[in-house]
Amino acid sequence: MLYDRIIKQGTIDEPDGKPAPDFALPSTVNWMRALRILAEDEGIDFGTATASYGKEGKRKMDVRVENTVLEQLFLGLHHLSALDQFRGGTTAADYARVGVLAWYYGIANAASAMTAAQSGSFQEDHAGTARLWDEQIASRGLAMAPFSWRVSSLVEKIYKVEVDALRNGSAGKLQTRPSTKNDALGAAAGYLSGSAKWYAWKTEEDLKRERAFKELGVDSFRSKAARTLRDQRLERKPMGFVHQAARYRGKANYREALFLAYGSGTETILSGYVEDMHSVLKAFLAMAGAFARRKLGKDLWSEFVADVDAKKAFTTRAGDIWA
């Protein structure tokens, strides 16, 4: 009954019907599994990440910048601790939605810590955080795979070539649960391509509201002038991992009520989902912490880890992630 009402009859905000959750749920779960497989294959932990950042030296920072780095990492650790507790639950659908939110905000906090450590920069909105992390970290080769995956442009003919290179010949599909690295390459490439397509569409919709487009006197991008205007905008827009994470969080927050929570087969599809989110966030936090340690210096870092483990009110230990 509820499916027919929401999906077929619609709601106040979507009178033509909400999008059906059937297609989106497997791809949502499978992307996270693919990330976990690829991160584990890379062997990301604090030790390997610290070695990876061996050429990064301590940076002189204002104390408020140091405090921002530490604050954002602490927030990320708190979100990881929430996911750690969710792993002990018996019904994945009970915490899948809030789990996605904990996962995303943990990623965003860790990303903010990295950009603050790198350049003293900080953004308080989702789009700004994603843009800054891609600009300051990923585009400079300072992220470990699979978090380094990005496209340099939202022009389709450009990003498709870049996605295919990352796919590396894999036949893996986003709709199929990955079990090997080869499967995971294809699934992760599928989500990257889909995200690029979605951000390109969003850019087009935003452009339609701008004066430059309205002055063309058209309502689509079929004309040469409109396509040129669009491509100039798309060409200047890269997209990285935190962009993908922000889109992912949006699905859980805004898609529709049935997503992650309705249907007899949902619990089966969600099997292992929270464990995957926990594993991926743990790897990202380990990477971010290793980067921050190099920039802050070992003395302040050791003091931070010791203080957190002495005074934190939640469960997960900083020393288990960052030592």
Over which residues does each language-model region extend?
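Terminal alpha-helical segments
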Residues: M1-A323
